[in-house]
């Protein structure tokens, strides 16, 4: 029964793997709820500050911030790539990196080079493998992202855009839709999107502001907060998507392990039955010979 012993060993191995994937599924479910709470808490702030920034872009303030201006002469664009630090989350990272690759090719076709900021180990490794120019990165964010860890690397691109060195800054991440669905997106962070401005105009809301103490100090602070909040929201969305994708992936792995165990047990029983039948046949044949 050497074959039976080998099958029993495989069954034991798959059962141990099933215990691990089940535990990871439960941990991911717990982290997912916390990540969703953080994401949903931050979403109203990021949406409101985006609306205010768009209002400023379509108004006629006495001071125009560099983030509102189009750097037409620049031949370099910035791309912020948000991925996970760890794997085992299905095709989530693959999908967002595929979207980033499409954007890089689009920029290349336009004669525009790219400088990247990687947030997450998976994106950093990918960008290094494809030979992209990575000017800064942030990894090891843990389960709770902190803005102070994010803004340093991102500020490299923001300062470059303000200095007129970049034509645009794009933000790529995985947007959380629901537990079973996440969407890879590449959004324009800078300059303020003309599509967003047009949407605000068609919605019928268009106004200017009175600035105190002066327009420059208010707008400078506000648009920096705008960029920071959108990057933080992207990371929060990405983390919620990560835990959801990992929970689903681990559940699928647990279910598959159960199916493999059932199939192995069936093979084991058939092998054992065949061995017993062979032994009985030999005994009967021996008795008949006597």
Swiss-Prot record:
Pfam families cross-referenced by the UniProt entry: ATP-synt
Subunit structure: F-type ATPases have 2 components, CF(1) - the catalytic core - and CF(0) - the membrane proton channel. CF(1) has five subunits: alpha(3), beta(3), gamma(1), delta(1), epsilon(1). CF(0) has three main subunits: a, b and c.
Keywords for this protein: ATP synthesis, Cell inner membrane, Cell membrane, CF(1), Hydrogen ion transport, Ion transport, Membrane, Transport
Protein name per its UniProtKB record: ATP synthase gamma chain
Annotated GO CC locations: plasma membrane; proton-transporting ATP synthase complex
High-level lineage: Bacteria, Pseudomonadati, Pseudomonadota, Betaproteobacteria, Burkholderiales
Keyword Cytoplasm: no
Gene: atpG
Job of this protein: Produces ATP from ADP in the presence of a proton gradient across the membrane. The gamma chain is believed to be important in regulating ATPase activity and the flow of protons through the CF(0) complex.
Subcellular localization: Cell inner membrane
Molecular-function annotations in GO: ATP binding; proton-transporting ATP synthase activity, rotational mechanism
């Amino acid at each position: 029964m050497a074959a039976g012993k080998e099958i029993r060993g495989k069954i034991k191995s798959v059962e141990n793997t099933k215990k691990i994937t089940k535990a990871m599924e439960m941990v991911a479910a717990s982290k997912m709820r916390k990540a969703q709470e953080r994401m949903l808490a931050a979403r109203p702030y990021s949406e409101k500050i985006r609306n205010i920034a768009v209002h400023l872009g379509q108004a006629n303030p006495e001071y125009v911030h560099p983030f509102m201006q189009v750097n037409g002469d620049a031949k370099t664009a910035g791309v912020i790539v948000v991925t996970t630090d760890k794997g085992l989350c299905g095709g989530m990272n693959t999908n967002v990196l595929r979207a980033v690759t499409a954007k890089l090719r689009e920029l290349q076709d336009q004669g525009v080079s790219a400088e990247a900021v990687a947030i997450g180990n998976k994106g950093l490794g990918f960008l290094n493998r494809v030979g992209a120019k990575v000017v800064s990165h942030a990894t090891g964010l843990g389960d709770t992202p902190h803005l102070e860890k994010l803004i340093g690397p991102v500020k490299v691109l923001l300062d470059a855009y303000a200095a007129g060195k970049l034509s645009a800054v794009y933000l790529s991440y995985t947007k959380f839709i629901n537990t079973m669905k996440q969407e890879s997106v590449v959004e324009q962070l800078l300059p303020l999107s003309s599509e967003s401005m047009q949407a605000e105009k068609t919605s019928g809301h268009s106004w200017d502001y009175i600035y105190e103490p002066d327009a420059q100090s208010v707008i400078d602070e506000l648009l920096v907060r705008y960029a920071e909040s959108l990057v933080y929201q992207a990371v929060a969305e990405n983390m919620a998507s990560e835990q959801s994708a990992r929970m689903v992936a681990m559940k699928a792995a647990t279910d598959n392990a159960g199916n493999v165990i059932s199939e192995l047990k069936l093979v084991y029983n058939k092998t054992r039955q065949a061995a017993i039948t062979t032994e009985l046949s030999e005994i009967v044949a021996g008795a008949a010979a006597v």
